[in-house]
């Protein structure tokens, strides 16, 4: 079975324009290679917020959804849409169903708002779907899944499409909420388990979090994209058109000319966050800095005044400033830790897979939280 999983598209987003999200999606997903897919999964958060029907965003979204249906219909691709976080989707993906009903040639479409198992007969595959915030009790979810398995007279499913978070993703979670148990789902699902919600792409054994298709804020400046699966192999497909959110660590020697060099090379409309000490001249004159870069969205994040030689806070570099979203002393610390553990301890294959899953989280862990001004 060939399929892709896209999630956390967030149409109607406040900071990343809907027009950009649609253009980015079109260039990255509606490709010649993806015309041979069997299934196109959207794993939640197609929308960012509840939208007014008279908004410009909605007009663009309706046209985009029609294009999505056309792409799937023309190429005989099944489209499966999962409800995401209630405060994002608000069951607005229902509009895709209505648009499809109006078409002369309809797409093979299903919109999953409930925990369910679907059997796709021509592919001979059972797919499990679980929307976000379905239950805060894992035992309850297991009971519901058991009932669905009995309805289909099966003991396992082939693929799972979820929205939420697994325990291994806890280090990147912004709050302590309900977490899925890895062992349970790895025993339940023969193939891959795909999960949306957290925007960072990670994996743990056969659990693959594709992350968001585009960037929505600072703190997620890593590569964005979606996941493509062919048989037993999966690959992360990067979105090279993702919106730019750039964090600049300002050091004592940084001047306005240095900022010019780095900011002016970014696409207009990019979001730029300056991390600087309260006593830095650029912080004191920050309003003038904002006026200088009117084509960009510039904000700041203050930290306590420190010397440039304080390597615990700064990444020591030869350049005037470091473009990064982390303050870790050794930016390759995950490699150091990985080499140390694998050389010192004898791990079996399962233990190695779990450990490497945690390392992949550490690689993307962001230590600086966004601050509005």
What label would you give each PLM region?
Residues 1-4:
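Extreme N-terminal starter segment of soluble prokaryotic enzymes
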Residues 38-40, 78-80, 125-127, 157-160, ...:
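Hydrophobic beta-strand segments of well-ordered beta-sheets in folded domains
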Residues 7-11, 45-47, 85-87, 130-133, ...:
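Active-site metal-binding loops of divalent metal-dependent hydrolases
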Residues 64, 80-183:
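Conserved catalytic scaffold of divalent metal-dependent phosphoesterases
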Residues 231-373:
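Accessory, non-catalytic peripheral segments of nucleic-acid enzymes
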Residues 172-234:
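Conserved beta-sheet core of the metallophosphoesterase superfamily
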Residues 72-75, 151-154, 183-189, 266-267:
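Short, conserved loop/helix-junction motifs that constitute active-site signature segments
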Residues 9-119, 186-188:
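Core catalytic region of metal-dependent phosphoesterases/phosphodiesterases
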